[in-house]
Every structure is written in structure tokens, then in C-alpha cells.
């Protein structure tokens, strides 16, 4: 993408000046590796990941090397971060609105005003795809009709959590079906064998830094056999640490320098 060309040009200049190699990674690889920085147990095995931000809301399948990232689902229209920012701005909050919107939502959850309101935003999920445009429309109309900002803010996070929970369950179901089918094609079919299915989910991107969203999602999936992995909020929203870690690992792989990841300052 053009927005990343400035950084690439700077890297090439530094490389030429210092005589060091340049390693190229995607923006998405950086976010995934940054989130995995606090979840080293995921490295070396396949897992799912949600990349949630203002520019991306994708469900990904990641291979053990982090080099093969396949998009298997996600939004069909606006992103989760766009939903948060647009409604936050509609409430008079500054862009980006995530942190302020979460504060308003937290207060509504604490004083029970959201629970008492009965207001709920719809969650639209089909297989591994979701939609947030209808949610934005209903929430915007509710604000125009005088619904309390805290109620709408809490409803937004509740909607995103319900949407992600449905996608997690659908992904597990599909993965289990695929694992069973593969087992049948290799050896005697063993109905119900789920040992080969992937059930670990890593959450990356700015939206994933929300404490409320994490708590809501964990609550909705606490009875589901799944591992949810979150990183420190600062690692959710910044992929620079991920790029640094990937470069250090590439250096070690090429036998140049064995760098300790502890040298990466967060």
C-alpha cells in the first residue's frame, strides 16, 4: 500500500548507510507478531487470529511460521474500528474515539444503565463473515432518538463481542469438520475425532486493546473449548514491535546475529 512506502524508503536508506540487510514483512505480519510477543506459546503451531482495527476486521488462519496468513473470514462492509470511531464522533468524541467511547461504555456497564435499558444492537454473522453497517445505522438512529450515549456505547462493544464469539464458534465447527474429513481420507474414519483441530485464537489490532471487549468475549466463550490470547494493549495497537521481532528472528535464521527479543523495548 502507498502509505507504507515512506517507511520502506527510510529502511532502505538506513540499510545502505549502515550496511545492514533489509527484511520486508507485511503490515499484517507485524500486528500478528506484536500480539504474539506476549503469547509465545502460539509460535510453532497453527492458530487463528482476528486483526481488528479501523482499517481491518479479518479472521485469519496462521501457519506455524507466521509466513502463511490466509484470510478466511471477516467483515463484508465497514470494520469494527470504523463502527467505534463513527459512533464516537457522532457522540461528539474526538477521532479516534475508541478510548473515550470505552470510558462511556464502562460507566454504563458499572451503573447498570445499559442492562436496565433493554437496548441491544443486532449481530449479523453468516458462516465466517459478518456485517457492521446495519449496526451503525441502528445505533446512529438511536442516538438521534435520544438514547443515552453510555447505553449506545456499551451496546456497540456488546455487539462486537457477540459477533466475534459467533465467528469463533463457526470457525471451530468448520475446523473440526475439516479435521474429521482429513482423518477419514488418510485412515479409517473416526467420527468425532477433534484432536487435529485448531482452537487457539489470537487478537490483534487497536480494537483488540479494549478491556471491555476482552471481558465480554471471554464471558461469552467461557463454556466453549477454545483458547483466547490477548496481548498488552500497547502491543495490540502498534505493529513496530512485531516487525522488530520478525527481523530479529530472520537474522537468527540466516545465521547472522542471534538477537535476544529482550532487547526490544516496549
Question: Where does each model-flagged region fall?
Answer:
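A short helix-loop
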Residues: 43-45, 50-53, 57-147, 249, ...
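Conserved small/polar residues in nucleotide/adenosyl-binding loops
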Residues: 264-266
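Short beta-strand-loop/turn "lid" adjacent to the catalytic site in phosphate-handling enzymes
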Residues: 1-12, 16
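Conserved phosphate-binding/catalytic loops in two-lobed NTP-binding clefts
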Residues: 23-25, 201, 218-243
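Short glycine-aspartate micro-motif
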Residues: 3, 47-51, 202
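A contiguous, well-structured pocket-lining segment that forms one wall/lid of small-molecule binding clefts
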Residues: 103-178, 182, 187-192, 197-201, ...
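Conserved phosphate-binding catalytic cores of ATP/NTP-utilizing and phosphoryl-transfer enzymes
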Residues: 20, 25-48, 246
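Active-site metal-binding loops of divalent metal-dependent hydrolases
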Residues: 55, 205-207, 233
Amino acid at each position: 500500500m502507498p502509505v507504507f512506502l515512506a517507511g520502506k524508503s527510510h529502511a532502505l536508506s538506513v540499510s545502505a548507510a549502515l550496511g545492514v540487510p533489509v527484511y520486508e514483512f507485511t503490515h499484517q505480519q507485524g500486528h500478528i507478531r506484536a500480539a504474539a510477543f506476549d503469547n509465545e506459546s502460539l509460535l510453532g503451531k497453527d492458530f487463528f487470529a482476528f486483526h481488528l482495527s479501523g482499517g481491518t476486521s479479518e479472521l485469519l488462519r496462521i501457519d506455524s511460521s507466521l509466513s502463511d496468513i490466509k484470510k478466511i473470514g471477516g467483515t463484508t462492509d465497514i470494520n469494527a474500528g470504523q463502527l467505534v470511531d463513527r459512533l464516537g464522533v457522532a457522540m461528539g468524541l474526538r477521532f479516534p474515539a475508541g478510548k473515550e467511547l470505552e470510558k462511556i461504555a464502562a460507566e454504563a456497564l458499572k451503573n447498570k444503565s445499559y442492562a436496565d435499558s433493554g437496548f441491544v444492537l443486532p449481530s449479523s454473522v453468516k458462516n465466517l463473515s459478518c456485517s457492521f453497517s446495519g449496526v451503525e445505522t441502528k445505533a446512529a438512529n438511536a442516538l438521534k432518538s435520544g438514547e443515552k450515549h453510555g447505553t449506545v456505547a456499551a451496546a456497540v462493544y456488546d455487539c462486537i463481542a457477540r459477533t466475534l464469539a459467533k465467528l469463533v464458534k463457526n470457525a471451530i465447527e468448520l475446523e473440526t469438520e475439516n479435521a474429521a474429513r482429513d482423518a477419514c481420507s488418510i485412515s479409517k474414519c473416526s467420527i468425532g475425532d477433534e484432536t487435529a483441530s485448531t482452537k487457539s485464537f489470537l487478537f490483534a489490532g487497536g480494537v483488540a486493546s479494549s478491556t471491555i471487549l476482552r471481558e465480554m468475549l471471554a464471558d461469552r466463550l467461557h463454556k466453549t473449548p477454545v483458547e483466547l490470547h490477548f496481548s498488552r494493549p500497547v502491543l495490540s495497537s502498534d505493529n513496530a514491535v512485531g516487525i522488530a521481532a520478525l527481523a530479529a528472528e530472520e537474522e537468527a535464521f540466516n545465521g547472522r546475529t542471534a538477537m535476544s527479543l529482550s532487547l526490544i523495548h516496549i
